[in-house]
UniProtKB/Swiss-Prot annotation:
It comes from the Archaea. Belongs to the CobD/CbiB family. Converts cobyric acid to cobinamide by the addition of aminopropanol on the F carboxylic group. GO terms for biological process: cobalamin biosynthetic process. Its main location: membrane. The gene is cobD. GO terms for cellular component: plasma membrane. It comes from Methanococcus maripaludis (strain C5 / ATCC BAA-1333). It is found in: Cell membrane. This is Probable cobalamin biosynthesis protein CobD. PANTHER family: COBALAMIN BIOSYNTHESIS PROTEIN CBIB (PTHR34308:SF1). GO terms for molecular function: ABC-type vitamin B12 transporter activity; threonine-phosphate decarboxylase activity. Pathway: Cofactor biosynthesis; adenosylcobalamin biosynthesis.
Length: 306
């Protein structure tokens, strides 16, 4: 288990400074690797189950091997630095590249700002950046819902899970997780093209998020009073509605926030979580939930290692 100061500083750097330029962003590099090997293995759009399953598996293995090697070597170089201030700072900065705390808040808050300014078209375009559904026909309620769903789901993907994996496995753990998560975002969805090619990525993402998503949900329950929610309602949402989404993991944080803040979240034709009106105040409180759950995680981790 690594020193808590690395996690605390990494989240601080990401939350208040933000991500590096795209040219040097590790996740962008991972995405380019995925595309490179996809072009090698899947040069045609024709569907062949056995071939696509096999080549999709090879794509995942090769990218993860490269990411592991690079992260491991970087970690070894950093750990060899004798000056503790430089070592801790550099490690934390590199680690912050695997976290998306600031971007999660900013992307989720953008549609809310458009709604406040009565710019529905701007809100539709903005929320399209954070969800895969068609937003052209969405009204105010469903735009706010999509924004809140994205924020609550990505508490796990963007922050809690990377912190958990770096805590246990160091930099390689954080960036291997980020690679799997990037795979899932790029080829893990059930389109015709990626139905079989993306299965390995999708299954691996589900496995790696199984425990972190439930930890994130419990953090949201405990911190409910701090973001304007209710512990009892959050508890109900986690245990009664957490399994109501197609994903085996994303529903736990979404249902917890929805019920805690007494609001209904809905992806039309797919799922409904919680009950109650979605207001601007509740939408903003759902973003506060992100900050408080991360803060509690860092406090608990620090106390456990004292």
């Amino acid at each position: 288990m690594i020193n808590p100061i690395y996690l605390i500083l990494a989240d601080f750097f990401d939350r208040y400074i933000g991500e590096p330029p795209e040219k040097v962003h590790p996740v962008i590099f991972i995405g380019k690797l995925i595309i490179f090997f996809e072009n090698v293995f899947k040069s045609t759009n024709s569907i062949n189950k056995s071939r696509d399953l096999l080549f999709g598996f090879f794509n995942v293995i090769l990218v993860l091997a490269i990411v592991f090697f690079m992260a491991y070597e970087i970690e070894q170089v950093i750990n060899s630095i004798s000056n503790s201030y430089i070592r801790i700072s550099l490690y934390s900065i590199i680690l912050s590249f695997s976290i998306g705390h600031k971007s999660l808040i900013e992307f989720s808050k953008a549609p809310i700002r458009y709604i406040v300014n009565n710019d529905i078209d701007g809100a539709k375009k903005s929320v399209q950046c954070v969800v895969s559904r068609n937003t052209s026909e969405l009204g105010k309620k469903h735009i706010l819902s999509a924004s809140i769903e994205s924020a609550s789901e990505n508490i796990t993907d963007s922050i809690i899970a990377p912190l958990i994996y770096v805590a246990i496995f160091g930099l390689p753990g954080a960036f291997l997780y980020r690679a799997v998560n990037t795979f899932d975002a790029m080829i893990g969805y059930k389109s015709e093209k990626y139905l079989y090619y993306g299965k390995t990525a999708a299954y691996l993402d589900d496995i790696l998020n199984f425990i972190p998503s439930r930890i994130a949900g419990m953090l949201l329950i405990i911190t409910a009073p701090f973001y304007g929610g209710k512990i009892k309602s959050a508890f109900y949402g986690f245990f009664k509605e957490g399994n109501k989404t197609p994903s085996p993991n994303s529903g736990y944080t979404m249902a917890t926030i929805a019920n805690s803040l007494n609001m209904g979240l809905e992806k039309i034709g797919c799922y409904k979580l919680g009950k109650g009106e979605i207001t601007i105040e509740k939408a903003l409180n759902s973003l506060k939930a992100v900050d408080y759950s991360v803060l509690l995680f860092l406090i608990i981790y620090t106390v456990l290692l004292m």
